[in-house]
Amino acid sequence: MPVDSTSTYVDALSEGWTMIDDLQSEKLMKDAGTDYVAQLTGQSDDEYRAYIRRGSLFGAFVRTVRGLTGAIMRKPPQVNAPVKVEELFGDFTLDGKDFNEVVRKVVTENVKKGYYGILVDSPPEGGTPKLAMYAANAILQPTVKRIGNEIKLIGLTLQENIDVPREDDPYETEEIEQVRELKIDEDGFYEQILHVNDGSGWVAGEPIYPTIMGKRLTEIPFVFFGASENSTAPKEGPLLDLGYLNVKHFIITVDYFHALHFCGLPTPFAAGFKLKDGESLHIGSATAWVSEDPQAKCGMLQLGADGIGAIEAALDKLEKQMSVVGSRMLDQARAGVETAEGLLIKQTSDFAILSSIASCTEAGMHDVLVWLARWVGASESEISKIKVMLNKDFSTSEIDPQVLTALFVALQSGTISVDSFLYFLKQKEVLPNHRTIEEEKSLILSGENTELVEKMFGSVVAEDVTDNRLKSASSVNTNGQET
């Protein structure tokens, strides 16, 4: 079995992954040709190329991925990591991505395909560890084994395509295909082997033995990401159905614009007209077609309105289906008022998918940071405190003015605390994301806001501010009385 063999899981999903890659641009869809749009019977190659060029890709899949990714990433990730690890955040990968860019990439790929991977690695000669990122199609074949009560990754092959200078011209590059093999050897230690395709087969290089603080690893530092769970075995991506609908929509647009082409350029026909050798019929205002045959006919052939209407109806139906599958991001605004309960029911499944992707990304990035922390020599105490938190509040609704007024009245009457009021503002993103509730209270209680403090919390607090004897807002109620 060659080193670039793929697992049965990858084989089952690779066609869908390729389709998703092609849906990223109209050019890729058209270049794929008969993979998606069949060549009509009797069409020449030139006619087929003109036929498929008339199609138009409706970017439903791409826009939905951007929308779902944006829902998770609209607030920056919150991270607690050792200082030595945070120092790596600005230059996190081999191609210079920072921490937030890495998280966004993981979320995007989880939304698109539901499978992704990161290898934590460092140069063979040592140095700063970096992250190497692998798309679903590049993760060829993981091998796992039960050791005790755990399922351990003991082998993994990864496809890589790198550009290297040409031997005959150093100013030009050529793409070299290689497979990076990660495995646990017979002695229980981690090693890497690069296999390069020289045109006649795969040639294995010398083994590489990565170390952490001078010690060889006993585990493979590769982290898998998924949409529903972080597993070595890939599952169908959350938007695969949307991808198939988008392809079907593209196929029908090819027929639609092909039909419009012939509607705009109707074909003339004539029957029963006798022509001499070399003679032809011409169209023009000064030309008339005359025949002695009473059965002669002439006219223009074109597609009827009913045919175009049927295609338009099919396109409209597909767009509505994509709207449903794609979390309603493409849905047109509906007339009338929808109840909050009805809206909540419609959003529940969408939010569950987003929440699952966010949770899986959190867990995977936590493991990545743990590997980095070990690599830079962080203590076990520091490692135990590592945490990654992504946004799981996907509601973008604005504050109802009546709700805000009612809460402010409750604040002034002493039926809710200052902290509760500020927490509400924090959740609704009225307060800056980087500012804590305690910092907001300190700003409110600053000397510049004495008049406002008196209006909101009473004269006792205002006097304390003036005298520079600030009292915590949590120990003073809204009537200015100490609690």
Give the residues covered by each predicted segment:
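C-terminal helix-loop subdomains that flank or include functional centers
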Residues: W289, K317-T483
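Extended, charged amphipathic alpha-helical segments
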Residues: V203-G342
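Extended, regular secondary-structure scaffolds
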Residues: V111-K113, G117-E229
